[in-house]
């Protein structure tokens, strides 16, 4: 149990720091679509795709790695709540086009990158 807690704790901290750095570096460039939040969710989509394949095909990996990557790192990196408030802020201000655009970018981008991550992992594993 101790190693599971440490894996989640360290992963979440690293994921949250990366999300914060992405926001600092990217959000100022296009305020209508905060690119830091978008980047965090798209990176998370790609990594979860890889992780889903790796952790289902490499069953011998210690469970702490899954907790570190998925529960910890990706839990700290990706953000549904920030995405939600960014979409709703546009909607409340009557900017329905922007609200739809932000929602569509996050959803379609995350699904596409999750699929790409799964494809990437399968290709890597097949080549190994």
Curated annotation (Swiss-Prot):
Fluoride-specific ion channel. Important for reducing fluoride concentration in the cell, thus reducing its toxicity. It comes from the Bacteria. Disulfide bonds: none annotated. GO terms for cellular component: plasma membrane. It comes from Burkholderia lata (strain ATCC 17760 / DSM 23089 / LMG 22485 / NCIMB 9086 / R18194 / 383). It is a multi-pass membrane protein. Belongs to the fluoride channel Fluc/FEX (TC 1.A.43) family. InterPro entries: FluC (IPR003691). One of its GO terms (biological process) is cellular detoxification of fluoride. PANTHER family: FLUORIDE EXPORT PROTEIN 1-RELATED (PTHR28259:SF1). Na(+) binds at residues 75, 78. Na(+) is not transported, but it plays an essential structural role and its presence is essential for fluoride channel function. GO terms for molecular function: fluoride channel activity; metal ion binding. This is Fluoride-specific ion channel FluC. It catalyses: fluoride(in) = fluoride(out). It is found in: Cell inner membrane. Keywords: Cell inner membrane, Cell membrane, Ion channel, Ion transport, Membrane, Metal-binding, Sodium, Transmembrane, Transmembrane helix, Transport. The chain crosses the membrane at residues 5-25, 35-55, 67-87, 96-116.
């Amino acid at each position: 149990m101790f190693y599971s807690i440490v894996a989640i704790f360290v992963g979440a901290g690293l994921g949250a720091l990366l999300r914060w750095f992405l926001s600092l570096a990217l959000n100022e460039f296009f305020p209508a679509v905060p690119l830091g939040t978008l980047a965090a969710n798209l990176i998370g989509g790609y990594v979860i795709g890889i992780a889903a394949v790796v952790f289902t095909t490499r069953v011998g990996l210690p469970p702490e790695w899954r907790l570190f990557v998925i529960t910890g790192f990706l839990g700290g990196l990706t953000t549904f709540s920030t995405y939600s408030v960014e979409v709703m802020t546009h909607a409340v201000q009557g900017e329905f086009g922007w609200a739809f655009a932000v929602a569509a970018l996050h959803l379609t981008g995350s699904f596409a990158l999750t699929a790409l991550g799964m494809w990437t992992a399968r290709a890597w594993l097949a080549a190994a």
